[in-house]
Each structure stands twice: as C-alpha cells, then as structure tokens.
Design a protein with these regions (language model features):
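Loop-to-transmembrane-helix entry motif
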Residues: 87, 91, 95, 289-296
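Divalent metal-coordination and catalytic microenvironments
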Residues: 16, 66, 88, 139, ...
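Alpha-helical transmembrane segments in multi-pass integral membrane proteins
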Residues: 1-11, 21, 25-52, 70-82, ...
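Membrane-interface helix-loop-helix regions
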Residues: 40-53, 85, 91-141, 166-189, ...
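Long, low-complexity, intrinsically disordered cytosolic termini of multi-pass membrane proteins
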Residues: 366-377
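Central hydrophobic cores of alpha-helical transmembrane segments in multi-pass inner-membrane proteins
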Residues: 62-71
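Extended basic-aromatic, gly/pro-enriched interface segments that bind polyanionic ligands
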Residues: 54-56, 60
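Hydrophobic, membrane-inserted alpha-helices
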Residues: 142-148
Length: 377
C-alpha cells in the first residue's frame, strides 16, 4: 500500500502479509488451549514453532512499523500534527467499525455493554480494545514517542540501543517487583518498544544486512531454535510439564526485535525489486489489506477452524491445520479488500502531506551521522 508520501515498497508488504499470516494461524490452531491443535504439541521442525507461537506476528508488525517510518521520514522534516492526523485517518475508521460490530455481537448475545464500553474507554491507555485493537493502542503510544525517538537517532545513530537497554531494565524491575512481567512485555509498549526501536536502528544500518544470506540464515535458525525451546517449555500459555522461566519475558521482546529487525533490513535491501510470481503477489495483496485482515479475522477464524474440523476433515494434526490455515488466510484476502475499499480507503484520501524537504531541517547536517542522511535503498 502506498504511503501518504506516495512511496511504495512491495517487499515490506510481503513482510506485513507474513505477520498477518502468523497471527491468523495462531488463532486458527488454538481456538482454545485444547484445539483444534492441542497447545501442548511441539513441531518436530523448529521453524514451525514460530507458526505454533504465531502471536509473535504482532512483534513483527511492530518492528516493521519502526523500520518503515524511519525509511519514510529519513532526512526529512516532519510536521507532526498532520502526521498524527494521518495516523488517525489510517487506524481509527476500521477500529471504530470493529468496536461497533463487537458491541452488536455482545448485545445479541445478551452480554453487559456497560463493561464493554468501559473497556473501550480504557483502551486509550490499556490493552482492552477488542479483536486485536489493543495493538493499535501500543502503536499510538509509539507514535507519541516517535518525534523524540527520531530526533535522538538522528543525533546519535545508536540511540535506539540505549532506549532498548532502558526498556530491558524497566522490565527487569517489574519482574523483581511483581515476580512476572509477561503482561507488560506482550500487551504494552513496555515490551514492544524494543521492536519499534530495533526497526528504526535496522533502517539506519541496513547496508550491513544487504546480501548477507548466511547471516540471515543463521539468525533464522537461531530464532527458530529459541522458539522451539520456548514452545516446548509451555509457550505463551505456560502449558506442558515444563514451563519457561517467567524472567524470559524480560528478554523475549528484545530477541524478537533483533531477529525481526535484521530480517526486515535483509529482505528490504536484498529483494527490493518487485516480484510478480503468484506467491509473492498473494503476499503483497495480503500485506496491503493486512490491517483489515488482522482486526476482522477474530470474528470468524475460530468458527472456520471448527467448521472444517466438524464437517470436512480432522485438523488436529498440526501440519494439516497449518495447510488449512494457509488456504483460509488466502480466502480471507477478498474480505480484507472489501473492508479496505469500503472502510479504510475513503478516509485515506483525506490524508495530508506531513514532510517537507530536508533543506528545511532545523538540525544541522554536521550534527548527524552520515548514515542517518542517506536516502532509502
């Protein structure tokens, strides 16, 4: 999807589509801890553990946001009021529609709407918005911090590393105080800040990742191995005979941030040319409509899995379920297109231009490292 600046990066849409698929598959596989695929199952191949723990797709979205905004705003002066207005036009219409649909669903089910709308109101600060809307809250908190983060990273290229270290120390302090930190690490900016920051840093050092196939493969293997261990140790829900130590959530967001940020920089710089083969076109379309797919899929993904399991074939086998999830995800792309066309696109036409040429940048060029003023590759 094109940004309001008119720039379009198909490789990043592929990554966005992958992130949506991870989250979709996680919910398809695990409508409940018992199935259709039992949560205690651990894939034999470590790479598949990332699918089994597909909640990590949210972290991939966050790292991509940091990278993309660093890329779009590199060497430019940003007018932040139009920027914030554009982000509201991008995110709020569909979120409002989802809130209304969920309210209707709960009303028809006889549930208390007072509690629901109280949670919606709290969603400005806390992760209480429905259907994945909690991650929009996290993104909004990132946008509020973005002016400061970009200014700091332009003055000192490795400033994001200092902020990541501060986030780790904050999570460590919360763990020492409360004995657990998973809630803050997964559901709030306290954990996802690492991914945004790593994305920003990855853009500025992206040349180090270009064409480094063996490095990318080593990171993928290491990250898959870690998630295989994490999955075997009970994963997100702490199920199984052994449970991962609760302190793992102090560093898990950082591990996700490092792996995803490097992967994004590698893919963006190494495979920037538009690809026209069918699988890439499908992922590109999925990426273009990923926001709609992400917010809407929870209305039907569990029912899809149950219908297939009850009426077509048994999907308790992890690998069979993943194939069905892939087919259902592709079938969901037209739903994303309709949502995008009818709900998102009309408001996107109202977006404002929020960048001015670098010549108007109030920060002297000499104050910035050379890599920070280079144009996107």
């Amino acid at each position: 999807m094109k940004s309001s600046t008119g720039e379009y990066y198909p490789a990043l849409d592929h990554i966005r589509g992958l992130a949506a698929f991870l989250v979709f598959t996680f919910h398809f596989l695990h409508a409940s801890p018992d199935g259709p695929v039992a949560y205690g199952f651990v894939p034999a191949l470590p790479l598949f553990s990332i699918l089994d723990e597909g909640h990590t797709g949210v972290s991939l979205f966050m790292a991509l946001s940091g990278y993309l905004f660093a890329k779009l705003l590199d060497g430019k002066q940003v007018r932040y009021l139009p920027f914030f207005a554009n982000r509201a036009l991008r995110l709020l219409p569909l979120l409002f529609a989802v809130i209304c649909i969920e309210a209707c669903r709960r009303y028809l089910a006889g549930e208390d709407l007072g509690t629901y709308f109280t949670d919606v109101g709290k969603g400005v600060v806390f992760p209480t918005l429905p259907n994945g809307g909690w991650s929009v809250t996290v993104e909004a908190h990132f946008y509020l911090l973005l002016p400061f983060l970009l200014m700091a990273s332009r003055r000192f290229q490795f400033a994001p590393l200092l902020f990541i270290a501060a986030a780790i120390l904050l999570r460590l302090a919360l763990y020492v105080q409360f004995g657990e930190v998973q809630w803050a690490a997964y559901w709030t900016i306290i954990g996802h800040a690492d991914q945004f920051l790593a994305g920003i840093l990855a853009f500025h050092v992206r040349a180090c990742a270009k064409g480094r196939h063996w490095l990318a493969l080593a990171v993928l293997a290491s990250f898959s191995g870690f998630f295989w261990w994490f999955d075997a140790a009970g994963g997100f829900y702490h199920l199984g005979p052994r449970s991962a130590p609760p302190w793992i959530w102090v560093i898990l967001p950082t591990l996700e941030a490092a792996a995803y940020a490097l992967g994004i920089a590698y893919y963006d710089t190494t495979f920037a040319k538009e690809r026209t083969s069918l699988p890439f076109r499908i992922m590109e379309k999925a990426g273009s409509y990923s926001y709609s797919i992400y917010l809407l899929h929870l209305f039907f993904v569990h029912e899809l899995a149950a219908f297939i399991d009850d009426n077509i074939m048994d999907v308790s086998n992890f690998y069979v379920a993943c194939l069905w999830s892939m087919a259902c995800f592709v079938a969901t792309i037209p739903v994303g297109y309709l949502s995008y066309s009818c709900i998102e696109a009309p408001f996107l036409r109202l977006r404002l231009r929020y960048v001015v040429p670098a010549a108007a940048d109030p920060i002297p060029v000499r104050a910035r490292p050379a890599a920070a003023v280079s144009q996107p590759g």
